[in-house]
Curated annotation (Swiss-Prot):
Name of the protein in question: Biosynthetic peptidoglycan transglycosylase
Lineage, uppermost ranks: Bacteria, Pseudomonadati, Pseudomonadota, Gammaproteobacteria, Lysobacterales
Gene: mtgA
Chain ranges passing through the membrane: 20-42
Any one Pfam family match given in the protein's UniProt record, by short name: Transgly
Annotated pathway: Cell wall biogenesis; peptidoglycan biosynthesis
Source organism (scientific name): Xanthomonas euvesicatoria pv. vesicatoria (strain 85-10)
Gene Ontology biological process terms from the UniProt entry: cell wall organization; peptidoglycan biosynthetic process; regulation of cell shape
Main location: membrane
Amino acid sequence: MGMDAWDGKQAAPPRRARRWLRWLMAAPLLFAAASVLQVLILRVVDPPISSMMVGRYLEAWGEGDWRFSLHQQWRDYDKIAASLPILVVAAEDQQFPMHHGFDLQAIEKARDHNARGGRVRGASTISQQVAKNVFLWQGRSWVRKGLEAWYTVLIELFWPKQRILEMYLNVAEFGDGVYGAQAAAQQFWSKDAAGLSPSESARLAAVLPSPRRYDARRPGAFVQRRATWIQRQARQLGGPVYLQGPSR
């Protein structure tokens, strides 16, 4: 009888282990469902703040700057100067209208460049930057990169290209604590985003790689040269009509 009881205990897996197993099996499905819901909601709802902005607050507070405040005000796509979207695409992601979230050619070029050493070159598309800035934290871990890829797939699947670009133009950092085209236009030139001139738009696009290092309002030689190059690239792409791309 004692042996039979022992065998029964050995055969039955502990309840706690079974619960953990069920949670481990359900967790990926729950995360996938939650992330899809996030993306579907933000297709139609303008976020009041992004994860990147939250991170900037935490960074400032961590440095003891409790008085830090950021500037951001949402503007719909059609309330932003037509020059800015095409200039941002010319600067950051010229294949944006055509790709589905990832520019494989740019990734290959960046990999070859970085293998030779020197300054590290990135290959993130606008879609990837939106995924990172809106949903995730800053960093270079493989976990974050994997989540970035997942969210990039989702926003390309559920959002039209114009929504992706609209989101980018409203959450991108154009100066220290200055997020989005409207805040940048007000802080730098005391105007609305709709009133940005082509040269002002080009300078905003020019500082995107390092918005805390470069100044769109008082541009140095590098920003001026880059802004001129960006304007030339935008003309070669065909101007704002280029953003229509293939039908989605």
